[in-house]
Amino acid sequence: MPHSQTSAPRGRVRLARGASPWLLPTVATAALSLVRARRSGAAKAVAVPATALAAGMLWFFRDPEREITQGRVISPADGVVQSIMPWKDGRTRVAIFMSPLNVHVNRAPLSGTVTSVEHIPGGFVPAFNKESENNERVVWHFDTELGDIEMIQIAGAVARRIVPYVPQGTKVEQGDRIGLIRFGSRVDIYLPEGVDVDVEVGQKTVAGVTRIDRD
């Protein structure tokens, strides 16, 4: 059964929190240009791209309801598995690349308590570049049934703003919305030693739906 607190009627779509700085001006510009287009032929040349941009922004910042999959660890992000790497401390890092066409809202991979939310300044190189590990990022730590789980939201060349939704000390349920990366980028999750990965490089993931560990 899906998680009761995050499941909702299918087909319902909301807009992501933290999107208003981009949505409000583009939608307002589109609305104004459409009004002016009725009176001026020249204004139609502005109305078409302005309306297309507003429609694109509404699509980019969609935040659909999800029926949350039960499992020990679920994907925190929509995207494609970019890499799976063993870490020196025994953990396994699963990196998920988020394109501008993916849903940008990230979700809690497990239930637990947010023990740390740290913003680290950095660069803005493309997320598929190895140097993106030095990009601006937000490092999360969760106290869960599996122990400490680390998750990192990494900004990319386009995504230059990460918006955490919940502060340190918050108790979250698996699949809860916890943050937004504007226009996509990358999310890394570190699985504890002894937890086997059940996804592969190139596989598509859906936040709150795709399970990334194996029993």
From Swiss-Prot:
Its cofactor is pyruvate. Binds 1 pyruvoyl group covalently per subunit. Keywords: Cell membrane, Decarboxylase, Lipid biosynthesis, Lipid metabolism, Lyase, Membrane, Phospholipid biosynthesis, Phospholipid metabolism, Pyruvate, Zymogen. Its main location: membrane. It catalyses: a 1,2-diacyl-sn-glycero-3-phospho-L-serine + H(+) = a 1,2-diacyl-sn-glycero-3-phosphoethanolamine + CO2. Signal peptide: none annotated. The keyword Membrane applies. It is found in: Cell membrane. The record marks G184, S185 as: Cleavage (non-hydrolytic). Pfam families: PS_Dcarbxylase. Transmembrane segments: none annotated. The keyword rRNA processing does not apply. It is a peripheral membrane protein. GO terms for biological process: phosphatidylethanolamine biosynthetic process. GO terms for cellular component: plasma membrane. Heterodimer of a large membrane-associated beta subunit and a small pyruvoyl-containing alpha subunit. HAMAP family: PS_decarb_PSD_A (MF_00664). This is Phosphatidylserine decarboxylase proenzyme. It comes from Streptomyces avermitilis (strain ATCC 31267 / DSM 46492 / JCM 5070 / NBRC 14893 / NCIMB 12804 / NRRL 8165 / MA-4680). The gene is psd.
